[in-house]
Amino acid sequence: MRDIIVLGAGIGGLVTAVTLSRAGYPVTVLEAHVYAGGCAGTLYHKGFRFDAGATLSAGFYPGGPMDLVAQAAGIETWHGRPTDLAMVVHMPDGEMIPRWADERRQHAYQDAFTEQSMPFWHWQEKTVDALWDLALRLPTWPPQTARQAVEVISTGLNWTSADLFHRISPGLLADVFRLVASQLHRAPGRLRQFVDAQLLISAQTTSENANALYGATALDLPRRGVRVFESGIGSIAARLV
């Protein structure tokens, strides 16, 4: 059996390496930095810890991405503190708007942006729920064999039938080609500012340039099992090393 070399000890590289190792393959991970985790790493300087990039992590819910990672890596539990308050956004006028994971988020949106903003949030949540449902079915993409192609088609049909009228709707298909801004044209200006601030962090662009499906997903972090790691985001990589 040949050795497998994984380039980079970011989260993707570490998950790949530990999964292959548990499957019986000899694996070597090559990393240029002195710490693992990549942009989800924690570095040390003069006795202090600094997160390299992200300070929050999501996906820690039953059946979620990090739950699947834990199963693949043989990790019984992630040592992070769950939180319903993912972040507080400070607006230019001084108002602080919380982003809750639970039903409080709806009240926060109405208080900050009025009822006029709710169609946008309903679109965002409905859209991203459909996308996560598809992604967590783990379709093989792109398919490499005829068998895999059949499996992808079967997965797609099962996903479509789970919410037929929404998932074959012209709106969802059109969002493949539209921008987030197309869903904000009737929304309050402050809402666009609020959305753009978060997209700049999670999608590295604003609603005028972010694809609608990608942007809806990028805005969904508070609802996806957020955890805070007391010793830094690099704790995730440490569990995988």
Which residue stretches match the model-derived regions?
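Active-site/ligand-binding neighborhood in enzyme catalytic cores
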Residues: 125-239
